Amino acid sequence: MSFKKYLSIALTLLVVLATFAGCAAPAAAPAAAPAAEEAAPTEAAPAEAAPAEGGETIKIGVTMLFDDRWLTSMREAMQAYGEGQEGVEVIFVDSKEDVAVQLGQVENFITQGVNAIVVVPANTDATDPMTQAAVDAGIPLVYVNRKPANLPEGIAYVGSDSIDAGIFQMEWIAEKLGGKGNVVIMNGNLSQEAAQQRTAGVKQVAANFPEIAITKEQTANWSRDEGLALMENWLSTGDPIDAVAANNDEMAIGAIQAIEAAGKLGQIIVGGVDASADALAEMDAGRLNVTVFQNAVGQGEGGIATAIALARGEPVEQIVWIPYELVTP
């Protein structure tokens, strides 16, 4: 694959994030603006609660899933960024992808008196109770990576515009298919905005090609093992499959393993999202055809930088987009 291109992407985004460190607030939204139908990002109102006084440690509580390879990379970036900031302590708890557990963790952070809370939501359609709890307590709240269905004024979000991942992925697949073929979609967790919007992006592009059919669609819950099992099931039907559009790399790798076991490696195009280390290795080996880079470091650092700025009472952009980039061999 073109490592120069990939490194250029990463370095560009890290330069953007360097602005966070310099001014203690997130960088301006990149050129890839939100869709026209969305209102332009507004400034998140500073928290009513007084920020940590001079000399006091700013404590940031983070609740997110631990058992996920990509999110682990993002968590490590959050931790490293926090450790690099003087007078900042970042506390992590495992949400276990459970809505009730996560709400309890947010409530515990409030009781502990943290200065800001960062959430990677277990369910993007069920964030209102967490939002209300933080607002009632006057504690700044930042959602990261998974954009809530409802993002009220004063609550910040740092992440990527999920529909773009599906669009970039499917545009490349459609071109390689010559505008015709049977495509299957592996969904992530459908209670989460990322899976919903990445899938919407794939379908949006496919709709422009009358001879491309979405023949199968099912969740594999972001899991390599579930992706393997689902692909085995699809292959066992004998139905023609020309391409797999997976919502993330882990499911794509599982699909590749099933395709290889069936003796069909090289006969079916496989696409993922994240550009994880494992995915790039699969691409170098000629097994993964396309992925879309999602910057774990950029999102992680941006989320903590935004939380720090809000804890200090500084204005920030309500939405900070960290753009996706296509990655091909």
Segment roles from a protein language model:
Residues 3-6, 24-329:
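A residue-level marker of the well-folded mature domains of exported/periplasmic proteins
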Residues 5-16:
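Sec-dependent N-terminal signal peptides
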Residues 16-17, 50:
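N-terminal non-cleavable signal-anchor helices
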Residues 18-22:
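C-terminal motif of bacterial Sec signal peptides marking the signal peptidase cleavage site
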